Amino acid sequence: MEDIMKKKMAAFLAVSMLLCGQALAADFSNLVIIHTNDTHGFDRRAEGINGMATVSALRKHYLSQGKDVLLVDAGDAIQDNNLVNFSKGKSAIAFMNAAGYDAMALGNHEFDYGQDVLAERIREAKFPMLSANVIVEATNKPLTKDSVIYKKGDVKLSLIHISEPT
């Protein structure tokens, strides 16, 4: 399995280097990337933490200005407060769907409720959850997509995620 990951990473890096010249020609002036991580399901603002309402309002603000917005999360979104723990992350996915997330990486805490619950959350999400290296043992198939490509205005973006071992 490790050899497959090394080959995938080498191919990804090779393609990335070939595309660098094209990226320099792209116009990024209208692109806004909103990134969250380690939100742990906080649906409202708390000390030092912006909630989903703030994230959603920020996205809507930029869209109203005609910006091309990409809203992504780097993981650890579905666990660690009473509401999301009670719903096993279901409420966090509902908030993220309502906020208009484009993609999410699997963090180590996405696995806290077990693989079956995570599979339910993946099905509920209106956005792809990504991980290039999580394989379901029973099927030997990937749990999620490894990458996704977005076109925002004149810019093409590829997102890929490699999960940290849990």
Model-flagged regions — what are they?
Residues 2-8:
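Positively charged n-region of N-terminal signal peptides that target proteins for export
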Residues 25-163:
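Acidic, metal/ion-coordinating pockets
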Residues 14-20:
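Bacterial N-terminal signal peptides
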